[in-house]
Amino acid sequence: MTTAAFTPWILGLTGGIGSGKSAAAERFVELGVHLVDADQAARWVVEPGRPALASIVERFGPGVLLDDGQLDRAALRQLIFADPAQRQWLEALLHPLIGQEIFSYLAKAESPYAVYVSPLLIESGQYRKTQRVLVIDAPQALQMERTLQRDNTSPEQVQAILNAQLAREERLRHADDVVVNDRDLAALHEQIDRLHHFYLTLRGGQP
């Protein structure tokens, strides 16, 4: 992406489920960096009244709605991970809409650089719209452990998500920077702080 005067230098942040990318993202926010999360944008585009939600209900039926009209994400997740073709259809519907929301928001950034967080940064091709890719990496056993502690889900469902996500080796192949998050939160913060200073240097800001 060509960086114009009103367009920020964008860092793409990604990692598999349970890798700790959300904790890394929170640290960037604490450091004053403008950030948008693809998961947040994905919620925005399927709010009641938005066209994407109507398309999802038309395809999957009213069983994917909660009583208040909101999308039942757990029900939809079970449907798409049981059927790769359905997952591909959903991604084809949502990715362009999510991208529009994200880059419209990032264009308003006032920090020296901005962070775009997405678990599908590589798969969606949106890493091409960033200037640098940071991958948060963790051993798969630790990803499984963290996800089971955090979410009300089964080991089988977590494994299905891991299997559906991009292979770890392929994700790392696209990385400009890698943070191995296999210790505690303080260790993660230390690595993010160091990279933050580096990114400020790249942007000509003050470390």
UniProtKB/Swiss-Prot annotation:
ATP binds at G18, S19, G20, K21, S22, A23. Keywords: ATP-binding, Coenzyme A biosynthesis, Cytoplasm, Kinase, Nucleotide-binding, Transferase. GO terms for molecular function: ATP binding; dephospho-CoA kinase activity. Pathway: Cofactor biosynthesis; coenzyme A biosynthesis; CoA from (R)-pantothenate: step 5/5. Its main location: cytoplasm. It is an enzyme of class 2 (transferase). One of its GO terms (biological process) is coenzyme A biosynthetic process. It is found in: Cytoplasm. It catalyses: 3'-dephospho-CoA + ATP = ADP + CoA + H(+). Its EC number is 2.7.1.24. Residues 10-207 form the DPCK domain. It holds the Pfam family CoaE. One of its GO terms (cellular component) is cytoplasm. InterPro entries: Depp_CoAkinase, P-loop_NTPase. PANTHER family: BIFUNCTIONAL COENZYME A SYNTHASE-RELATED (PTHR10695:SF46), DEPHOSPHO-COA KINASE-RELATED (PTHR10695). HAMAP family: Dephospho_CoA_kinase (MF_00376). This is Dephospho-CoA kinase. It comes from Pseudomonas putida (Arthrobacter siderocapsulatus).
